[in-house]
A protein has these predicted regions:
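An N-terminal domain-cap segment
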Residues: 1-60, 77
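C-terminal edge-of-domain segments
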Residues: 12, 107-108, 112-160
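Short beta-strand segments in beta-sandwich/barrel cores
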Residues: 19, 65-67, 92, 134-137
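Conserved hydrophobic/aromatic beta-strand scaffold that supports enzyme active sites
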Residues: 20, 31-35, 87-89, 127-129, ...
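Short glycine-enriched loop/turn motifs at secondary-structure junctions
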Residues: 39-42, 86, 121
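Surface loops and adjacent helix of pleckstrin homology
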Residues: 50, 70, 140-142
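Short, structured beta-strand-loop surface elements
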Residues: 52-112, 125
Length: 160
């Protein structure tokens, strides 16, 4: 991956607060959208999900999910297949309110998504942490890079 592609990937993951989520239960796939906050070292991604949402019920049965981000499309982009995009696969787990890291995770999530503060007062929402295991980064049409936790960790350092 060249430095420009590393910059694109870092930006997608650090600033992207809206991601597609793919879940599956009983051989029934489901894709939806969720708000997401990247941890500073990109080792995990925080989701604050309602138990009323179908995707939450799916991931409670099968914690293997995929999250995907894309650079924004727009009128100045003649071909959306040229947009940078990333898809990460891994596992998600709930963060108990009495867990040692809950307060830190909540603070980070609200720093990235301050409008979500009122949702933390609702009883049907729970904080989850997604840990990526594998992924694919496509910086543009016809170019693809397989990525893993070590690649994400390398991105969390200072830009080169």
């Amino acid at each position: 991956m060249n430095p420009e592609e590393q910059r694109q990937l870092r930006e997608l993951l650090r600033t992207g607060r809206w991601a597609a989520i793919a879940t599956a239960r009983d051989n029934e796939p489901l894709a939806s959208w969720v708000a997401v906050a990247a941890e500073d070292d990109l080792s995990g991604f925080l989701l604050h999900l309602s138990h009323l949402a179908l995707h939450t019920r799916y991931l409670e049965v099968n914690p293997r999910i995929s999250l995907s981000w894309s650079a924004p499309d727009g009128p100045d982009q003649p071909d959306p297949q040229q947009l940078a995009r990333v898809s990460l696969q891994g596992r998600v787990s709930a963060i108990s309110r009495d867990a040692a890291g809950y307060a830190v995770a909540r603070t980070l999530y609200l720093h990235r998504l301050p409008q979500a503060a009122q949702q933390f007062e609702l009883g049907d929402f729970e904080l989850y942490r997604f840990v990526p295991e594998t992924g694919r980064f496509v910086p543009g049409f016809g170019r693809v890079h397989r990525i893993g936790p070590d690649d994400l960790g390398a991105l969390s350092g200072p830009e080169k």
